[in-house]
Amino acid sequence: MAAAPPSADPLDKALIVDVDQWIEQLYECKPLSENQVKTLCEKAKEILEKEPNVQEVRCPVTVCGDVHGQFHDLMELFKMGGKSPDTNYLFMGDYVDRGYYSVETVSLLVCLKIRYKDRVTLLRGNHESRQITQVYGFYDECLRKYGNSNVWKYFTDLFDCFPLTALVDGQIFCLHGGLSPSIDTLDHIRALDRIQEVPHEGPMCDLLWSDPDDRGGWGISPRGAGYTFGQDISETFNHSNGLTLISRAHQLVMEGYNWSHDRNVVTVFSAPNYCYRCGNQAAMVELDDDLKYSFLQFDPAPRRGEPHVTRRTPDYFL
């Protein structure tokens, strides 16, 4: 007798039961065991490595920016935006570092991805990298919570598989950072080999590191990676690719969202009171069936018994 064809969905019934239990546990901010994280990352890799560099997303969708390990504020985001999978979510990267709950935050988002893969899109941010996480907190948090670096390794290996960008209904282009002088078209992005550590330079690096700027043309980025790009660049890119908007994250904005380049670009930031001290609001963008947008702003969740903030790491863009 011929063997049954492999299921298109890598989740079997037993794993669905496990993942549902993990999600329930993580909603209580209780980390998974090291072995559970290993299984989680193996299953997520099967899904994420098949996704293209420009992931097609249908509206309605709610688009979110950086969350940076601020787990209780992610709960606030879900309270405002709706629970998964009722709401279709697109996150534009930077799940880890800076906040105190990177492990729980990224574990939950990856669980939701494998459980509801067509209702959750996870893009790669510049912090989804081995080098950056060793400086800004995720590596140290993994050592503290697990006693070794295995969980950090499982996740940073998985980060190599995250798609770089998304395209909502062919019109709204979503990514973490910004544009690149090496990239004129979405087809250029589709042709990149993304399954690797974030390079120090080049088009993949630029997509995760660049920022819009008031000055025209391309400029040297003060971050030491990526570029700054002016309104002329955004307008040309949008026109050439039939886009109405570039939605990106990567920069703290005090209202949670900020228009630039004559509404060719919007920045969305979803970590309120960033680093537990910046005093900013957070936001997400709801795109309805007709791609009409509304911004949902939210404040930080009440904090109970969180560790005292110490400033140990350099602030490369505060």
Curated annotation (Swiss-Prot):
Endpoints of the signal sequence: none
Location of the protein in the cell: Perikaryon; Cell projection, Axon; Cytoplasm, Cytoskeleton, Microtubule organizing center, Centrosome; Cytoplasm
Ligand binding (Mn(2+) 2): 94, 126, 176, 250
Cofactor(s) named in the record: Mn(2+)
Catalyzed chemical reaction(s): O-phospho-L-seryl-[protein] + H2O = L-seryl-[protein] + phosphate; O-phospho-L-threonyl-[protein] + H2O = L-threonyl-[protein] + phosphate
Enzyme class: hydrolase
Cofactor binding notes: Binds 2 manganese ions per subunit.
GO cellular component: axon; axonal growth cone; centrosome; cytoplasm; cytosol; neuronal cell body; perikaryon; protein phosphatase type 2A complex
Catalytic residues (UniProt): 127 (proton donor)
Pfam families associated with the record: Metallophos
Function noted in UniProt: Protein phosphatase which plays an essential role in early embryonic cell division. Probably together with constant regulatory subunit paa-1 and regulatory subunit sur-6, positively regulates centriole duplication by preventing the degradation of sas-5 and kinase zyg-1. In addition, plays a role in the recruitment of sas-6 and maybe sas-5 to centrioles and may dephosphorylate sas-5 and zyg-1 negative regulator szy-20.
Family per similarity comment: Belongs to the PPP phosphatase family. PP-1 subfamily.
Assembly and interaction partners: Part of a complex consisting of a common heterodimeric core enzyme, composed of catalytic subunit let-92 and constant regulatory subunit paa-1, that associates with a variety of regulatory subunits which confer distinct properties to the holoenzyme. Interacts with szy-20 and regulatory subunit sur-6. Interacts with regulatory subunit rsa-1. May interact with sas-5. Interacts with unc-51 and unc-14.
Protein name: Serine/threonine-protein phosphatase 2A catalytic subunit
Organism whose genome encodes this protein: Caenorhabditis elegans
